[in-house]
Amino acid sequence: MDEFFEKVKSQQDPFKRLASLIPGFGGYIERQNRRDADKLLRDTVARRFDEQWKRTSQLQVEMVSSGMIQYVDDMERAALQLRTFIDKISTAPRGYSGLFDAVKINEKELEAIYQYDAAFFDLGEQVARALDHVEASLGDREALPAAIRNVTSLARTAVETYNRRSEVVIGDGK
């Protein structure tokens, strides 16, 4: 998230830079920048997962065209899990009070949040590879069910990871 935070900070208008010199106002600007960086990060993750969701839908069309209708429902479960994750991460409120309202941020919590954020990008790559495997397995009716289950499992993991990140952000994480 540091990369996103620095990007937001560098795009700050001159008025905000000047106002950040006013005592107390700098904390406000800092919170706003963190909120903006968090939103930018979540939008980026959502776009990457949306690409995979579209691939999932396209694979369903290919299954129907190839007469593999019996696998479409399983693939739909994977698509629904992906869509659930995309909707959660893209529609979450901009900034959370537990993370953004305090001027001083707990480094341990921030590190945990960064780890979850990195996990989202890793999960996106894993989903892409799993969908590659589904696509490669379209001709192998024995391997296809396991490949689809893997996509569903990874999509479910993305939703669970988002929920755990939210717990850390709002202060309910253990």
Please name every model-derived segment.
Residues 137-174:
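Preference for long, well-ordered alpha-helical segments
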Residues 1-60:
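Leu/Val/Ala/Ile-rich N-terminal alpha-helices, chiefly Sec-type signal peptides and the beginnings
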Residues 54-147:
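Charged linear interaction tracts used for macromolecular binding and regulation
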